């Protein structure tokens, strides 16, 4: 298990951990099944940064800062992955922009290029703005630390689910070829249940106003984020025929944005009373 965990961290982060000298598909599958737990570690790190920024920027007698802690939280997630997933999102945007005019094969070639085009820059800008804006809203509602934790786990869960047996690689080389179809359905289901359980527990014990209502909100965000990633994955499969490392990165970033949006939602008062949310 330790080898699989180290492999997961070396595949998904730039943390200074010693990974295996060689990663085969079997090991890659076990590592990708642990991707949500990598998200848990990253979420704890980013959540701590959000909380610390709130503390050091607080001004007595004034409303607490929300934008700066949100920017710091999103930045920490980008730094510990060296922008890997954002780069994948940018390449995915360029590939989608080229797909209709140039076809699947040319779009995949464009996704491999090191330069970023207009479509890639635009999609990264919009997704990051959504992440920062939604996280800022959750911070003002005193659930920012919980929100970034849930988003980090759910977005990495999207990568796990994208590597199940039903999803092929889009090309015969690269990260997609290494991990596509390697995660067993049972392991993916267990990962999903584990993320729901951790999200519920985190919501229940949240130091900034935890309780049953917050736990339900966190689980709802996991479900909606996972649903968004499923629909997006199906759409991308129709365009590219499989997954690549860039597609996984794009799924992670967009799922994180969707999860944060759910955590930021204002739920109507009758629904709050019915479900016990706050």
Swiss-Prot record:
Predominant location category: membrane
Cofactor requirements of the protein: Mg(2+)
Keywords from the UniProt entry: Cell membrane, Cobalamin biosynthesis, Magnesium, Membrane, Transferase, Transmembrane, Transmembrane helix
GO biological process annotation, one example: cobalamin biosynthetic process
E.C. designation(s): 2.7.8.26
Matches recorded under InterPro entries: CobS
Residue spans crossing the bilayer: 31-51, 66-86, 115-135, 148-168, 187-207, 215-237, 247-267
Reaction it catalyzes: alpha-ribazole + adenosylcob(III)inamide-GDP = adenosylcob(III)alamin + GMP + H(+); alpha-ribazole 5'-phosphate + adenosylcob(III)inamide-GDP = adenosylcob(III)alamin 5'-phosphate + GMP + H(+)
CC terms in the record's Gene Ontology section: plasma membrane
Record localization: Cell membrane
Metabolic or biological pathway, per its Swiss-Prot or TrEMBL entry: Cofactor biosynthesis; adenosylcobalamin biosynthesis; adenosylcobalamin from cob(II)yrinate a,c-diamide: step 7/7
GO molecular function annotation: adenosylcobinamide-GDP ribazoletransferase activity; cobalamin 5'-phosphate synthase activity
Membrane topology: Multi-pass membrane protein
PANTHER family per the UniProt record, alphabetical: ADENOSYLCOBINAMIDE-GDP RIBAZOLETRANSFERASE
Function: Joins adenosylcobinamide-GDP and alpha-ribazole to generate adenosylcobalamin (Ado-cobalamin). Also synthesizes adenosylcobalamin 5'-phosphate from adenosylcobinamide-GDP and alpha-ribazole 5'-phosphate.
UniProt family annotation: Belongs to the CobS family.
Protein name in UniProt: Adenosylcobinamide-GDP ribazoletransferase
């Amino acid at each position: 298990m330790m080898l699989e965990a180290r492999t997961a961290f070396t595949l998904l982060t730039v943390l200074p951990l010693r990974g295996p000298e060689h990663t085969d598909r079997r090991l890659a599958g076990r590592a990708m099944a642990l991707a949500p737990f990598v998200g848990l570690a990253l979420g704890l790190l980013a959540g701590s940064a959000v909380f610390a920024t709130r503390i050091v920027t607080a001004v007595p007698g004034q409303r607490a800062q929300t934008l700066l802690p949100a920017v710091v939280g999103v930045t920490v997630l980008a730094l510990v992955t060296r922008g890997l997933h954002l780069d994948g999102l940018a390449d995915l945007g360029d590939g989608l922009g080229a797909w209709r005019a140039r076809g699947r094969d040319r779009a995949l070639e464009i996704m491999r290029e090191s330069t970023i085009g207009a479509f890639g820059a635009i999609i990264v800008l919009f997704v990051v703005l959504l992440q920062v804006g939604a996280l800022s809203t959750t911070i003002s509602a005193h659930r920012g630390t919980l929100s970034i934790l849930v988003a980090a786990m759910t977005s990495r869960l999207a990568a796990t689910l994208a590597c199940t047996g039903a999803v092929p690689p889009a090309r015969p080389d690269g990260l997609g070829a290494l991990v596509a179809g390697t995660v067993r359905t049972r392991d993916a289901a267990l990962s999903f249940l584990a993320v729901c359980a951790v999200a519920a527990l985190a919501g229940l014990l949240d130091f900034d106003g935890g309780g049953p209502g917050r736990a339900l909100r966190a689980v709802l965000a996991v479900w909606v984020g996972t649903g968004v990633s499923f629909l997006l994955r199906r759409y991308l499969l129709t365009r590219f025929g499989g997954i690549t490392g860039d597609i996984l990165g794009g799924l992670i970033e967009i799922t994180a944005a969707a999860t944060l949006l759910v955590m930021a939602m204002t739920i109507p008062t009758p629904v709050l009373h019915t479900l016990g949310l706050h």
